[in-house]
Regions:
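Short histidine-centered beta-strand/loop micro-motifs
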Residues: 26, 49-54, 95-97, 117
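Conserved short histidine dyad/triad with adjacent acidic residue
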Residues: 23, 38-53, 88
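Glycine- and acidic-residue-biased ligand/ion/polar-headgroup-sensing regions
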Residues: 55-67, 72
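A short hydrophobic beta-strand segment most commonly corresponding to one strand
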Residues: 39, 85, 100-116
């Protein structure tokens, strides 16, 4: 069991993104056996480029703001209170063109390594 006070997770820059941060709220260091929970912040004007994870699904919940998320060939405008499911292997991206920051929780299966394959030529291959 673990309880982390607010502000204890350290924000880190999201690789290959502009104006986006990730905080690992619950992870392997907390003893979580199956899943890990992260909080993403996408600043106004920020984006995370198109990428996919070969063997990682995402369950997300929008905490604050509005932003666009592309999943496969579809684009969705999401807002506070919306839930999102992204299957493993599905290309996805995020863009916040609004005047306020957006935040969402993202729960993923626990893995030794999180591979992110960026599909835009300049992005290459990265791990997150």
């Amino acid at each position: 069991m673990s309880v982390k006070p607010a502000g204890r997770a350290i924000p880190q820059k999201v690789e290959n993104a502009v104006g986006a941060e990730i905080e690992w709220l619950v992870d392997r260091h907390d003893g979580a056996p199956n899943f890990e929970m992260r909080k993403f912040t996408i600043k106004s004007g920020g984006s995370i480029p198109k990428h996919y994870h070969p063997d990682i699904e995402h369950e997300q919940f929008v905490l604050k703001g509005r932003y666009k998320v592309g999943i496969g060939q579809k684009v969705y405008e999401v807002r506070e209170g919306d839930s999102i499911y992204i299957p493993a292997g599905a290309p996805h991206w995020y863009e916040n063109s609004n005047n306020e920051d957006a935040e969402f929780l993202c729960i993923v299966p626990k893995k030794e390594k999180y591979d992110s394959v960026y599909t835009e030529a300049e992005s290459g291959l990265a791990s997150s």
